[in-house]
Amino acid sequence: MKYITAISMLATAALTAATPLNGVEARWGSGGGGGGSTCDNNQQQVCCASVLSLICLVDVLGGNCNGGSYCCDNGASVGGLINLNLLNCVQIL
């Protein structure tokens, strides 16, 4: 039983180490001097209200988010109310 736990932890560490980080660096915006709290021109701010971030709405009116805020590369889904490109999002710190 301990071997299975050790092997699963080793596999998780190997997958984490193999994850490319060059795409994440490109998505962080300068934010126009806002300390990284705003999105670039090519990105859209998205508010996620749920704990699991499954329900994310585009911030149309520019209001504050009560949940988590993310900058997303929307591409083809610009103008939609529901963000379908959840993998292209980076959380705003």
Curated annotation (Swiss-Prot):
Instruction: Tell me the first and last residues of the signal peptide.
Output: 1-26
> Which cysteines in this chain are paired by disulphide bridges?
39-71, 47-65, 48-56, 72-89
Q: Which UniProt keywords apply?
A: Cell wall, Disulfide bond, Secreted, Signal
UniProt induction comment: Expression is up-regulated during mycorrhizal symbiosis with Vaccinium myrtillus.
Q: What results from gene inactivation?
A: Does not affect mycelium morphology, wettability nor growth under stressful conditions such as toxic heavy metals (Cd and Zn), oxidative stress (by H(2)O(2) and menadione) and plant-derived organic compounds displaying toxic/antimicrobical effects (caffeine, tannic acid, gallic acid, quercetin and caffeic acid). Leads to a reduced capability to colonize Vaccinium myrtillus roots.
Q: Which domain of life is it from?
A: Eukaryota
Coarse class of the protein's main subcellular location: secreted
UniProt subcellular location: Secreted; Secreted, Cell wall
Q: How does it assemble?
A: Self-assembles to form functional amyloid fibrils called rodlets. Self-assembly into fibrillar rodlets occurs spontaneously at hydrophobic:hydrophilic interfaces and the rodlets further associate laterally to form amphipathic monolayers.
Identify its protein family: Belongs to the fungal hydrophobin family.
Describe the function of this protein.
Aerial growth, conidiation, and dispersal of filamentous fungi in the environment rely upon a capability of their secreting small amphipathic proteins called hydrophobins (HPBs) with low sequence identity. Class I can self-assemble into an outermost layer of rodlet bundles on aerial cell surfaces, conferring cellular hydrophobicity that supports fungal growth, development and dispersal; whereas Class II form highly ordered films at water-air interfaces through intermolecular interactions but contribute nothing to the rodlet structure.
Specify the protein name. Answer: Class I hydrophobin SSP1
The scientific name of the source species is: Oidiodendron maius (strain Zn)
